[in-house]
From Swiss-Prot:
<keyword id="KW-1133">Transmembrane helix</keyword>
<feature type="transmembrane region" description="Helical">
    <location>
        <begin position="208"/>
        <end position="228"/>
    </location>
</feature>
<dbReference type="InterPro" id="IPR003855">
    <property type="entry name" value="K+_transporter"/>
</dbReference>
<feature type="transmembrane region" description="Helical">
    <location>
        <begin position="399"/>
        <end position="419"/>
    </location>
</feature>
<dbReference type="InterPro" id="IPR053952">
    <property type="entry name" value="K_trans_C"/>
</dbReference>
<keyword id="KW-0472">Membrane</keyword>
<keyword id="KW-0630">Potassium</keyword>
<dbReference type="Pfam" id="PF22776">
    <property type="entry name" value="K_trans_C"/>
</dbReference>
<feature type="transmembrane region" description="Helical">
    <location>
        <begin position="290"/>
        <end position="310"/>
    </location>
</feature>
<feature type="transmembrane region" description="Helical">
    <location>
        <begin position="15"/>
        <end position="35"/>
    </location>
</feature>
<keyword id="KW-0769">Symport</keyword>
<keyword id="KW-0812">Transmembrane</keyword>
<dbReference type="GO" id="GO:0015079">
    <property type="term" value="F:potassium ion transmembrane transporter activity"/>
</dbReference>
<feature type="transmembrane region" description="Helical">
    <location>
        <begin position="142"/>
        <end position="162"/>
    </location>
</feature>
<dbReference type="InterPro" id="IPR023051">
    <property type="entry name" value="Kup"/>
</dbReference>
<feature type="transmembrane region" description="Helical">
    <location>
        <begin position="368"/>
        <end position="388"/>
    </location>
</feature>
<feature type="transmembrane region" description="Helical">
    <location>
        <begin position="104"/>
        <end position="124"/>
    </location>
</feature>
Length: 630
């Protein structure tokens, strides 16, 4: 009997371990919302005093926002809409692009808009969450008020400084620390529910709807703050591949949702009894002796939440690079065992300067909270639209049935988006500017590479025609030299520019010549047996193809070993890799505005060398340059 139950016990332990890990990574962001969400929701209605019904209505809005948007949309539905186990906007986009018929451009812009909004979120979340936690020091002693921003800056600078070292050593503590945070939140909320048991009326959605109807315009403004309760919900979907659906769902229903609900109920009951606590209900719920430990624990929780968002930005950027939305960047692995732990120095630096700018410009979590909701609501609307396409294309639902399921969610999210748009003049323009910048960058790169490909195709020589001409015996034939040459190309049907330049300038042709194309699949990973393929074109020329998933490291040197196992004979350390380096020159007839030409060329010049990106042996790489008018 014990032998039969052993696998079940092992599976249970694994589920619990994964669920604990997801508490630290997936739910870190949404778990810090109680620090400021209820406080910010109270501000628009607190000028003339807040009635008991208004407080109950606010808490009801928060609980039902968590129920409808997070529980129903993300936890129960979207976690099933995966791309071979991976979630997130770009993963969903990659899946849909495979079967899109005639409206790929719309899907592309929706996808990059969602990705760009997430980058804005990745800048605002660390600044807002760390500031909101450190501000608790003002309640410990007012003498520390002037030190809130400097302390937050030091914490954030340290967080970005350690990214290059990796988080493998400390990440095992993220889950337990965040679990303690949720337990403490739930406990302190539960203790204060007894302050006014009428807060249980918040479970009745009537009070949420009545609040909106009675408050009118102010109610719409309040919705922008209420939405802060669900910020971080996108992380559930984006981190699907790291933990899996069941652990994320299990953690939500057993720990996170109950703790958040208890805390918001407790804050509501506490303010019902103590109206003067509206200035900071979360920290004021703690007794004086527990305030400093609560601030320290909150700071630790916000650091973990910030780390999760930064890691998410790294992962999303890698996906965008592999899908051809961004130029190649340096990607370093910070763990030998966890392939998902990566470090992108360019992205880290960009996020650091962005976060620092937000901290110094806004100076407080109250000011920064007004800028927060737009990026998150925008990303959620994008995800809902992509989910509609997923239901139609992948699950083969009729359009009317898919619309019937998602339209209520879409309408609700549009209401939240409209409420957040009212805050544009108070700082809401910041995430819009950040997102617009990255949309332009990704659109320019995608558009520029397409134009460049079209232009080079017109002047390229078909590969098979070239092989026939070069292998004819004539006095102009290049000198045959021993050894192997691998020529990288993005178009296997055309002759690589590096091969043409090698013959033109060096007048030599190697005994073995491999034309290598590197493909990125629309799936997260490519099975080992489908990684490589080869086709012999002639005695001296072979066409090779290496395929990677958009979540994989594109280590070409490692993949070439699979060719040798399949029978192709060559020694990688005696093989020369020939790469073409293009010097791009703008052209008035490029098809893009002049400013976009310049931006595309700047992006191309900033891209990391292919030899570094594809992990080629640097002492075996030969680069041959050419001018290309774009």
């Amino acid at each position: 009997m014990s032998q039969l139950s052993a696998p079940g016990a092992e599976n249970t332990r694994r589920l619990l371990a994964m669920a604990l890990g997801s508490v630290g990574v997936v739910y870190g962001d949404i778990g810090t919302s109680p620090l400021y969400a209820f406080r910010e929701a109270l501000r628009p209605v607190s000028h003339d005093g807040v009635t008991d019904v208004e407080i109950v209505g606010l808490i009801s809005l928060m609980i039902w926002a968590l129920t409808i948007i997070v529980t129903i949309k993300y936890v129960l539905f979207l976690l099933r809409a995966d791309n071979q186990g991976e979630g997130g906007t770009l993963s969903l986009l990659a899946l849909l692009m495979k079967t899109a018929n005639g409206h790929t451009a719309i899907l592309f812009f929706m996808g990059i808009a969602g990705a760009a909004l997430f980058i804005g979120d990745a800048m605002i979340t660390p600044a807002l969450s760390v500031l909101s936690a450190v501000e608790g020091l003002k309640l410990v002693t007012p003498a520390l008020s002037d030190y809130v921003v400097p302390i937050a800056v030091v914490i954030l600078l340290f967080l970005f400084a350690v990214q290059s070292k990796g988080t493998a050593a400390v990440s095992k503590f993220f889950g337990p620390i965040t679990l303690v945070w949720f337990l403490v939140m739930g406990a302190v909320g539960f203790m204060h529910i007894a302050d006014d048991l009428s807060i249980f009326r918040a479970f009745n959605p009537y009070y949420a709807v009545a609040f909106l109807f009675n408050e009118g315009y102010v109610g719409i403004v309040v919705l922008g703050a209420v939405f802060l309760t669900v910020t971080g919900a996108e992380a559930l979907y984006a981190d699907l591949g790291h933990f899996g659906r069941r652990p994320i769902q299990w953690a939500w229903f057993t720990v996170v949702f109950p703790a958040l609900t208890l805390n918001y109920l407790g804050q509501g009951a506490f303010v019902l009894k103590n109206p003067e606590a509206m200035s900071d209900p979360f920290f004021l719920m703690f007794p004086k002796w527990a305030l400093l430990p609560a601030v320290i624990l909150a700071t630790a929780a916000t650091i973990i939440a910030s780390q999760a968002v930064i890691t998410g930005a790294f992962s999303l950027t890698r996906q965008a690079i592999h899908l051809g939305f961004l130029p190649r960047m340096a990607i370093f692995h910070t763990s030998e065992t966890h392939t998902g732990q990566i470090y992108l120095p360019n992205v880290n630096t960009l996020l650091m300067f962005g976060v620092m700018a937000l901290v110094f410009i806004f100076g407080s979590s109250e000011s920064l909270a007004t800028a927060y909701g737009i990026s998150v609501t925008g990303a959620m609307v994008v995800t809902t639209v992509l989910a509609f396409e997923f239901l139609r294309m992948r699950w083969n639902w009729p359009a009317w049935w898919a619309a019937g399921v998602l339209l209520p969610l879409f309408a609700l999210e549009l209401v939240f988006l409209g409420a957040n748009m009212l805050k544009i003049h108070d700082g809401g323009y910041v995430p819009i500017l950040i997102a617009a910048t990255f949309i332009v960058i990704m659109w320019t790169w995608k558009r520029g590479t397409a134009i460049l490909h079209t232009k080079t195709r017109h002047i390229d020589i078909p590969l098979e025609r070239f092989i026939k001409s070069i292998e004819r015996q004539s006095e102009h034939a290049p000198v045959s030299v021993p050894g192997t040459a691998i020529f990288l190309t993005s178009d296997p049907e055309s002759t690589p520019a590096a091969l043409l330049h090698n013959i033109k300038h060096n007048h030599v042709l190697h005994q073995q010549n491999f034309i290598l194309t590197i493909r990125t699949a629309n799936t997260p990973k490519v099975p080992r047996e489908e990684r490589v393929s080869a086709r012999r074109l002639s005695e001296r020329f072979t066409l090779m193809e290496v395929r990677f998933g958009f979540m994989e490291t594109q280590n070409v040197s490692q993949a070439l070993g699979l060719f040798r196992k399949s029978g192709l004979k060559f020694d990688i350390m005696s093989t020369s890799f020939y790469l073409g380096r293009r010097k791009l020159v703008p052209d008035a007839q490029s098809g893009m505005p002049h400013w976009q030409d310049r931006l595309f060329i700047a992006l191309a010049n900033a891209a990391i060398d292919p030899s570094d990106y594809f992990r080629l042996p640097t002492n075996r790489v030969v680069e041959l340059g050419s001018h290309v008018i774009i």
